[in-house]
Swiss-Prot record:
The lineage of its organism: Bacteria, Bacillati, Cyanobacteriota, Cyanophyceae, Nostocales. GTP binds at D19, H20, G21, K22, S23, T24, N136, K137, I138, D139. Residues 7-189 form the tr-type G domain. One of its GO terms (molecular function) is GTP binding. It comes from Nostoc sp. (strain PCC 7120 / SAG 25.82 / UTEX 2576). This is Elongation factor 4. Belongs to the TRAFAC class translation factor GTPase superfamily. Classic translation factor GTPase family. LepA subfamily.
Length: 603
């Protein structure tokens, strides 16, 4: 099965914005080449996580090997590597691009180029991939292929004379796409006789076989039974299972340069088989590793605590298993006076955080409390030390810090010009600095802003979508740290600070934020037998306060008329009890209160 010469192998991926039809196109290619028969076919075949199907997005990378008889009569092997399209998952995209020589750029013929498509195209150009433009959904009544071709040529600078018009849903243009892949995507270089170097582009954990690694052989040959060495983690393993993904796993005995496959080697932890690592042979090690791998740095942090303290170990185990599949997830144990034991987790963005939370709850049956997301702040102390703080409760006291710097991102939005005003207003409300505005083609504009990441991670994306009725798209990347007058906003309930509700905010926004948090918590915290004060403070200065009135039992219900002193005695006894209760009683803060903090409308 693997005796195909490198000249007849094509490795390609599909780049597209969310909802431009990438997974459907992948389904059609699998059907057209007979890789999956009609009986097994289901929508979004390569999206094999329930969550992916439900949300209609691709999260984990998939790969599929297709055999294709081209018009020139030759038999070709096409390796399709599926890529996610959401802004949070750009690290997964860069790994899959490194394993390819070509890319299909899928653009919705009715919507045109979107911001995320642009970001991925630039990544593909950095990897020197041959890009084939495909205009999808041309069967829609609103499709305007000529306008979109103009957009691609103008915005990306690609020659679209060979653009393919297709409709994955109707199966139009599928054969043209396959032919274009054969003709235009360059074959992998024939480096079979060099020392083995292979790139890991994905891995997942199988409870029976350990970690299964997806890889692309760059140079040399790998055989079943070989002892391999992973260059970054410096571990050795023996390959006990080797195969290709077609798209289900089929064992083979060896794979040559240019081929894509998987192997199992009883690897216990995914941390030992890091994505982007280079595989080589123990007895003939490559001199240098493959270039281009960078550690994925989390941008957003939050605390995760099990509602039931007994589930702490289960949560640790679940996070370890998710980390297996998700190189970008980071976590470390933390304790909170309000919530007990839990973990501080780092994510690439908000969608990534939601997905991890949902997978923990769905796949591992955990009930979690998630604290408000925060970003990594840089604190310069009075002694001149640089500290990186991802948890507001670790912030040094005001007297010990010289200044606080926060991360800024460059946000590029592509939007119909009708919504430019409202998006500019949103960006300015989020402390954005206007940088640039370009008119692309008729009716579409790009806006460029520099905005603090803390303002983007809460609900900027949702706000942008709702203000533009879903038409605008955005892409962001980190541009560095800048100093701002930031303060730590503490929330005190019944006189005790709740560390999980603390946040770092801009001084100008602190009052409004404190007021709305106090009001929100007043609605959400259930009434207790005693009066509960809620205060928002900066340092020792209280800037907003509310209180929840006590529930009181009518102790006079059984007194009919009679002497006032009897009633007074009962009321004083009740007051004394309330006083004692207030000093020892604890206030339960429900999960909704933490979620409400996430959704505080800042716009």
């Amino acid at each position: 099965m693997t005796d195909v010469p490198a000249v007849r192998i094509r490795n390609f991926c599909i780049i597209a914005h969310i909802d431009h039809g990438k997974s459907t196109l992948a389904d059609r290619l699998l059907q057209a080449t007979g890789t999956v028969d009609e009986r097994q076919m289901k929508e979004q075949f390569l999206d094999n996580m329930d969550l992916e199907r439900e949300r209609g997005i691709t999260i984990k990378l998939q790969a599929a090997r297709m055999n294709y008889q081209a018009k020139d009569g030759q038999q070709y092997v096409l390796n399709l590597i599926d890529t996610p399209g959401h802004v949070d998952f750009s690290y997964e995209v860069s790994r899959s691009l490194a394993a390819c020589e070509g890319a299909l750029l899928v653009v919705d013929a009715s919507q045109g180029v979107e911001a995320q498509t642009l970001a991925n195209v630039y990544l593909a150009l950095e990897h020197n991939l041959e890009i084939i433009p495909v205009l999808n959904k041309i069967d829609l009544p609103g499709a305007e292929p000529d306008r979109v071709v103009g957009e691609i040529e103008e915005i990306i600078g690609l020659d679209c004379s060979g653009a393919i018009l297709a409709s994955a849903k109707e199966g139009i243009g599928i054969n043209e796409i396959l032919e274009a892949v054969v003709e235009r995507v360059p074959p992998p270089p024939n480096t079979v006789d060099q020392r083995l170097r292979a790139l890991i582009f994905d891995s997942y954990y199988d409870i029976y076989r350990g970690v299964i690694v997806y890889f692309r052989v760059m140079d040399g040959t790998v055989k079943k039974g070989d002892r391999v060495y992973l260059m970054a983690s410096e571990k050795e393993y023996e390959i006990d299972e080797l195969g290709v993904l077609s798209p289900t796993q089929k064992p083979v005995n060896e794979l040559h340069a240019g081929e894509v496959g998987y192997f199992g080697a009883a690897i216990k932890a995914v941390a030992d088989a890091r994505v982007g690592d280079t595989i080589t042979l123990c007895n003939a090690k490559a001199t240098e590793a493959l270039p281009g791998y960078t550690e994925a740095n989390p941008m957003v942090f939050c605390g995760m605590f099990p509602i039931d303290a007994d589930q702490f170990e289960d949560l640790r185990e679940a996070l370890e298993k998710l980390r297996l599949n998700d190189a970008a997830l980071q976590y470390e144990p933390e304790t909170s006076s309000a919530m007990g034991f839990g973990f501080r987790c780092g994510f690439l963005g908000l969608l990534h955080m939601e997905i991890v939370q949902e997978r923990l709850e769905r796949e591992y049956d955990l009930d979690l409390i998630i604290t408000a997301p925060s970003v990594v702040y840089k604190v310069i102390t009075t002694k001149g030390e640089e500290l990186y703080i991802d948890n507001p409760s670790h912030l040094p006291a005001p007297n010990d810090r010289e200044r606080i710097e926060e991360p800024y991102v460059k946000v590029e939005m592509i939007t119909p010009e009708t919504y430019v005003g409202t998006l500019m207003e949103l960006s300015q409300n989020r402390r954005g600095i206007f940088k640039d505005m370009k008119y692309l083609t008729q009716g579409r504009t790009t806006l460029t802003y520099e905005i603090p990441l803390a303002e983007v991670v809460t609900d900027f994306f949702d706000q942008m979508k709702s203000r533009s009725r879903g038409y605008a798209s955005m892409e962001y990347h980190l541009i560095g740290y800048r100093e701002n007058p930031l303060v730590k906003l503490d929330i005190m309930i019944n006189g005790d600070p709740v560390d999980s509700l603390a946040m770092i905010v801009h001084r100008d926004k602190a009052y409004g934020m404190g007021r709305s948090m106090a009001e929100k918590l007043k609605e959400l915290i259930p009434r207790h037998q005693f009066k509960v004060p809620i205060q928002a403070s900066i340092g020792s200065k209280v800037i907003a306060s509310e209180h929840i009135p006590a529930l009181r039992k009518d102790v006079l219900a059984k007194c009919y008329g009679g002497d006032i002193s009897r009633k007074k005695k009962l009321l004083q006894k009740q007051a004394k009890g309330k006083k004692r209760m207030k000093s020892v009683g604890t206030v339960d803060v429900p999960q909704e209160a933490f979620m409400a903090v996430l959704r505080l409308d800042q716009s």
